[in-house]
Amino acid sequence: MKQNALLLKKIELPRTPAEWLEAVMNFLFFLCGILAVGCVVLISVYMIASGVPAIRKIGLFRFLFGTEWASTAADPKYGILPFILSSVYGTLGATLIGVPVGLLTAVFLSKAAGPRVRTVVVTAIELLSGIPSVVFGLLGMQVLVPAVARAFGKASGACLLSAIVVLAIMILPSIVSVSVTALNAVPPEYEQGSLALGATDTETWFKISVPAAKSGIAAGIVLGIGRAIGEAMAVMMVAGNSPNMPDSLFRSVTFLTTAIAKEMSYASGLQKQALFSIALVLFVFIMLINVVLNVVLKGGDRDER
């Protein structure tokens, strides 16, 4: 009884309107957090429930490491290794192009560009981020694909290379915008101290500012990778959409996302279940990328401390 009385004394109801408003806002923040977590949990449960049955029927090894996809054949095959490798190679290639270009652009905008140039470039990047995926795909199909075919003497330019270039352009706004914000947040004392010790502007930017902003820059890279690996429409218009192994940059390929988009409208039975399994694999990939990058960043922060 005494313990209950003490607990009741500790729980004090808000008295003033400001305290009531604070209590209501705290409850709303808590509710929004629970809602966000609940959405992730529901999506995860739905993906697992929809994707696991096909994997059980097909077999995990045959599904993940099979090299042939023929879902509408008389004897259907459900091997998604070509899709996995195409997505990995495409995302990796786009990252290798987009990250250096995006980071250098962010450093330029944050540290070197004049006000007028910064305004023009930032406006262009904001416009680029607002362009729909289908427009990127249309431009790639009409301009990039024929250019690749002519430049390399190929019958068709719809291939892995075209997809990589389009994805690299599409991830630039995410990387640049977040990186600029992170670089602008670096305390000016860091740079002033470096310059006072005799370092050049370039040395200060890349040895002081960029390492100090690495968490924010990494967040931009994660957003870019997420956009690249999850893109479907633009890739479907420039990659060729043939379920081939990506053994060449000029090979017509199918990504995990485009396999789903291409067949889901008419799929049924085991074929539809297999497409949900592909979505589950894609979901796991994105989660693993986020976890690995978070672990690496936290490890780097602990080492610095």
Predicted regions and their residues:
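Interhelical loop and adjacent transmembrane-helix boundary motif
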Residues: R150, V235-F283
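C-terminal transmembrane helix and the adjacent membrane-cytosol boundary/short C-terminal tail
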Residues: V180-N184, P188, L195, K262-R305
